[in-house]
Amino acid sequence: MKHSHEEIRKIIPEMRRVQQIHFIGIGGAGMSGIAEILLNEGYQISGSDIADGVVTQRLAQAGAKIYIGHAAEHIKGASVVVVSSAIKDDNPELVASKQKRIPVIQRAQMLAEIMRFRHGIAVAGTHGKTTTTAMISMIYTQAKLDPTFVNGGLVKSAGKNAHLGASRYLIAEADESDASFLHLQPMVSVVTNMEPDHMDTYEGDFEKMKATYVKFLHNLPFYGLAVMCADDPVLMELVPKVGRQVITYGFSEQADYRIEDYEQTGFQGHYTVFCPNNERINVLLNVPGKHNALNATAALAVAKEEGIANEAILEALADFQGAGRRFDQLGEFIRPNGKVRLVDDYGHHPTEVDVTIKAAREGWGDKRIVMIFQPHRYSRTRDLFDDFVQVLSLVDALIMLDVYAAGEAPIVGADSKSLCRSIRNLGKVDPILVSDTSQLGDVLDQIIQDGDLILAQGAGSVSKISRGLAESWKN
């Protein structure tokens, strides 16, 4: 059943005594989406960020009061303050909020409030969250269910990462990086996979991380549904502890929604899903890689379990253009040594880099892959150092940028120079360290060959750098 936006108030009560909501770090992907939803629900929104950008400009045009830089006076009039996990304790707006006894909450607590009166579908996991959330959102939109969605990245076909729908459905990416997904109380929870990442949150203890995921799944009501990947041995080990209905998906023979006959032609994937009722569904995807077949099958399983027709599911998946910065093709360019294709990808964990390389190899045949890699966080580089050395040795040519610190202090032996040294010692590829990114175009022109696929890889500023490169190459 759909409702007009005026009727939303009848099913989603107003937050009492809350007129103005202030966001510290409003430009972040997760923060901006929640701000946009609340703005469209009729709340006054203000927010600050260290830099202006497309996201902050869009929010300002929609009616939010945006400040660039942080100052105590920015919180004037706020009924509640929302902080992102990147905000430090000495932030002047955070300090002023506490002094004035204004409630300060995490981003996930506000997302939980938005979800409280809705039918929530939360997507968690180390990899694939953003794409899976986007796919489910598009299926529900295609089925004319007008869902609200809040994603950690751009939903390309919607042109934004958040949307206020006029129905009870809310589809959201659940963030395990700071364990804040424990605030959410969804009806359906998807877990795509689980690997050691953000281990500082879990005190370096993978068992603690597993226990936190089980706790997240226990937030489901007894009549809720957990959708979990059967290909992930860690998740399958947790299934007996979940205590809720569990549906599985994957390439595994044990999966309830089983993928068979996967083939990739160019950057297109097609395969068959065998469903629990012996139904067979043929799926076409316009995003490459087996990892995307898994993401799509998670979305298909949720939709089937919730009674959505096959036609809407298959149309949405065939039309799916990807999530922002997920194997984002920036174009083909003529360079002095020949024609190259440039792709931007957000993957910043060794497993994500590995599946991106595999998808590129499948679609690009025997052509060379040239990677521009920017490590993200010193702590991740330290914790997964050997895995990075192995996976970055799989490309044909490697340009390494300096570590994107994301606010962290440098860690000895976890910098780009150390990575390059270890990769060189392995002997499969000879990396080139480029600390001055203004030199990147010149360095590339010296090493690229006709037909190369250039992969700009990482979660930091490498996307902006690669897009700047694409712009300069167009001229």
Swiss-Prot record:
Cell compartment(s), UniProt: Cytoplasm
Any one Gene Ontology cellular component term annotated for this protein: cytoplasm
Gene3D superfamilies for this protein: Mur ligase, C-terminal domain, Mur-like, catalytic domain, NAD(P)-binding Rossmann-like Domain
Enzyme nomenclature, EC number: 6.3.2.8
Record keywords: ATP-binding, Cell cycle, Cell division, Cell shape, Cell wall biogenesis/degradation, Cytoplasm, Ligase, Nucleotide-binding, Peptidoglycan synthesis
MF terms (GO), sorted A to Z: ATP binding; UDP-N-acetylmuramate-L-alanine ligase activity
This protein's pathway: Cell wall biogenesis; peptidoglycan biosynthesis
Family: Belongs to the MurCDEF family.
Cited function: Cell wall formation.
Protein name: UDP-N-acetylmuramate--L-alanine ligase
